[in-house]
Amino acid sequence: MLKVRINDRELEAKAGDALRDVLLASDILFDFPCGGGGSCGQCTVEVEPASSVEGPLHHGLPLACQAVLRADCSVFLRVQADAWVNAAETGEVEIDEADRLVRALTLTLVPPSLEDQRSDWTRLSEALTAAGLESENPDSALLGDLAAGLRSDDWTAHLLVEGKSLLGFSPRGKSCYGFAIDLGTTTVDVALYDLETGRQAGRRTLFNRQVAYGADVISRAAAFRRDHSAVRTAASSTIAEAAEALLEEAQVATASVVRTVVVGNPIMLHILLGLDPFQLTQAPYIPLITDPVRRPPAEFGFSFQGKGVVETLPLISAFVGADTVGVIVALGLGAETRTSLALDVGTNGEIVLARGGQLSATSAAAGPAFEGAQISCGSRAITGAITHVTVEPENVTCRVIGGGPGRSICGTALIMAVAGMLDRGVIDETGRIVEAEEVGSQALRERLFEREGLLAFALTEDRSVFITQKDVRELQLAKAAIRTAIESLMAETGTAWSQIERVHLAGNFGAGMSVSSEIRIGLLPPTPLERVDTVGNAALRGAALVLLSRSGREEACRAARLCRYVELAGRPEFQQSFADALLFSWGAGV
């Protein structure tokens, strides 16, 4: 056996083992943006001695996804995904008592006798029916609690009811809790709520462990076909890690957790449900199911929930999922009287237009550039990542997570840097990084250098973090996809930009973004800043409203049913609109 030291961990492996397999088997979270294909060059590692691994090199370093172990070695993961990411906002969800979805109910039953030998379940079922509630077949968790639950208080049953459905027996004297979960492609956001008060008892955001199988949903779908159990477990274990930490922190027992609501894009939810999402990746792009799904927690492997149900929100289409439904619910777009646009930018961009009581939605495959993937020095928002950049005439200043030296650049910083480079004449409107003699500032000219035949612009003094011409092109492709989707949706609904009264920027990415920078690169048209608001993770808040309230659940189902999906594929004007959108300006006619 070989001895392999990875950062601070000592592991064993066999000669000929792939380093990527060792990382996965050891539960070490590490990004493989292209899914292990060796094409993105972003999983480079330092190995000592260098001769202990075989495989292709990128900038003189082995790729973790291609490296094969041959001898004892030490491996240093230069950019390792942080296990925990701080969540931006917390807070309660105000729910009227009459609108509360989960409530306590007490039923007094007639005790059994030699003359009345009905089973425990028959006895409870008939009492539920008499109270106007449903009495479906009980699951194993409810049956396990049945005998003690009925006899502990002399046949007075203390129950928890969700609408007209029985969730289980109430933990007497204790609050009952539930989880709202946003299962994202990149991150998983989990919040714990008191179901009676709407109080948020805690929140955690983690990187989705599926990042080891690729940065985008197409990579995940392909990986699911190769190893469906591992890919599904990567998602469920990420959720469980966050949920268990929240329960421990809030000192809440698993028996008190009775309800969980999950939102996510269609491929993420298909995978969580154990359904093959492959048909979502091929025309005509038909999901297996768009309805809400309700299952016992055991079917998801959710050991952090003792009883009750796990529910997913409905989908709108193969490309607009339950996360978008959550955004609609959270922002009240279904009842919006103003003409409003909601935009969730990420690897997959979703756009919703509310106008005249009608909802229309579309999506754009922006790719992973907004998340820092496929960028030379790109990364997620992890320790050492540059999040904000200001390009001044004589200097470049950077804000770094953790406060140390910058080691990488995340999507928000990429947009801000390119916007600043445009303002200072380092990039022209076509996206070309200009020659040094075309830049007016001597300090900025000195930041231009050639790397592998392409011009690059240094963000750090030592040139260790930089933006290349290829990186600028990647950003252009990503923002053009979003912009074209916005324009197409507005054209389809006959809406001019001047009619848009409110723009909502949703998602963790939108929360950290400079709106003026988005306008400068042409992602949004010139817009008064007071018309734009960043709403954070609205999908998670929508999940919380469905978790806690009858009206939230009803609105989610109504929104999914009434929202019209606008398909962009095959439109004759799409390619020309996309080409125009590559420019770093919005142009006329909006």
Show the residue positions of the predicted features.
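Nucleotide/phosphate-binding catalytic cleft detector across ATP-hydrolyzing
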Residues: H59-A180, T185, V231-S236, A240-T254, ...
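A short helix-loop
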Residues: V352-R355, R380-A443, A556-L568
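A contiguous, well-structured pocket-lining segment that forms one wall/lid of small-molecule binding clefts
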Residues: L422-T493
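Catalytic phosphate/nucleotide-handling subdomain of diverse soluble enzymes
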Residues: R355, A491, T495-A560
